[in-house]
A protein has these predicted regions:
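Active-site environment of divalent metal-dependent phosphoester hydrolases
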Residues: 6-10, 36-39, 62-65, 125-127, ...
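Short glycine/proline-enriched coil/turn segments at helix->beta-strand junctions
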Residues: 24, 49-54, 105, 173, ...
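His/acidic metal-ligating clusters that form di-metal
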Residues: 92-120, 125, 130-182
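N-terminal active-site segment of His-dependent metallophosphoesterases
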Residues: 1-44
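Divalent metal-coordination and catalytic microenvironments
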Residues: 4, 33, 48, 58-59, ...
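Conserved beta-sheet core of the metallophosphoesterase superfamily
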Residues: 161-220
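Hydrophobic "anchor" residues on beta-strands that sit immediately upstream
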Residues: 27-32, 54-55, 117, 177, ...
């Protein structure tokens, strides 16, 4: 599991080399925000073609989709590291948008030890305080109605309430949930939610990866 890459795919490659990542046996999952701020955002197209690489959609992917569709705030996107997009030909922009629209908002993984792992970019989209993982999935897929779906989308992509409140409440119906979005100085756990964006978009940050079987982790610093 890798935190927000933000266009630093060479750094991700270095991390996988360090881990002796085997493309025949291993899989890598991403909490989203693969693009913007870093120098290799366009490489996302190549990475998403790899059969062993799986990602959820982050808010930066959503910003790209919105801007290309004509419903986004392009100046805001540029301020947040999206200038690279507008240097591309329109057909490449459309290809990127189409590819990113296909990314799921939630991924669920069954491990060999019968544990279930969830992945979402910002926060599990629980709408009501007693909701669990199943209710979050129902909300994001529209089974709980259009209003709940809109709220769930916003929560999944942008929310920071749990970490802002240092809420250690366990989300029922799932063993662990991995999220990014909120930058933390080191991999941080609140209840059964694990925050793994350690800020590789910033000069004093790092890219962190967690083995979801063993819960061991490595971080590669952005500073020399």
């Amino acid at each position: 599991m890798v935190g927000d890459v933000h266009g630093h795919f060479k750094l991700l490659t270095a991390a996988l080399d360090k881990l002796n990542f085997n493309t025949e046996l291993d899989r890598i999952f991403s909490v989203g925000d693969l693009i913007d701020r870093g120098p290799e955002s366009i490489d996302i197209l190549n990475w998403l073609e790899k059969p062993w690489f799986h990602a959820v959609r982050g808010n930066h992917e959503q910003m790209l989709i919105d801007c290309i569709s004509g419903h986004g705030d392009i100046p805001r996107h540029i301020r947040n590291g999206g200038a690279w997009l507008y240097e591309l030909q329109p057909d490449i922009q459309q290809e990127l948008s189409k590819t990113l629209q296909a990314l799921p908002l939630i991924i669920e993984i069954e491990l060999s030890n019968d544990h279930t792992i969830g992945i979402v970019h910002a926060e599990a989209p629980v709408i009501q305080s007693n909701d669990g993982w199943q209710e979050a999935k129902d909300a994001i897929t529209g089974k709980s109605g259009e209003q709940h779906q809109r709220q769930a989308l916003k929560t999944a992509l942008y929310a920071r309430e749990k970490i802002d409140q240092q809420d250690h409440t366990t989300i029922k119906g799932i063993d662990r949930i991995y999220v990014g979005h909120s930058t933390v100085p080191s991999v941080t756990r609140l209840g059964n939610v694990v925050y793994i964006d350690t800020g590789c978009a910033f000069s004093d940050g790092a890219l962190s990866l967690v083995d979801i079987q063993t819960e061991t982790m490595i971080s590669i610093s952005m500073s020399p």
